[in-house]
């Protein structure tokens, strides 16, 4: 089940609005 994470997509960059415990480059 995917996590729902609030985020904003700005200037081509995905910016989560809260701390996300994923390693750099990791996808879920």
UniProtKB/Swiss-Prot annotation:
Pfam families listed in its UniProt record: AF2212-like
UniProt KW Methyltransferase keyword: no
InterPro entries attached to this UniProt entry: AF2212-like (IPR008203), AF2212-like_dom_sf (IPR024069)
Highest rank taxon of the organism: Archaea
Gene3D superfamilies per UniProt: AF2212/PG0164-like (4.10.1150.10)
Keywords: Toxin-antitoxin system
Keyword Cell inner membrane tagged: no
Role summary: Possibly the antitoxin component of a type II toxin-antitoxin (TA) system.
Family membership noted in the UniProt record: Belongs to the UPF0165 family.
Record-given protein name: Putative antitoxin AF_1079
């Amino acid at each position: 089940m995917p996590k729902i994470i609030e985020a904003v997509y700005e200037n081509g960059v995905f910016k989560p609005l809260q701390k996300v415990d994923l390693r750099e480059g990791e996808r879920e």
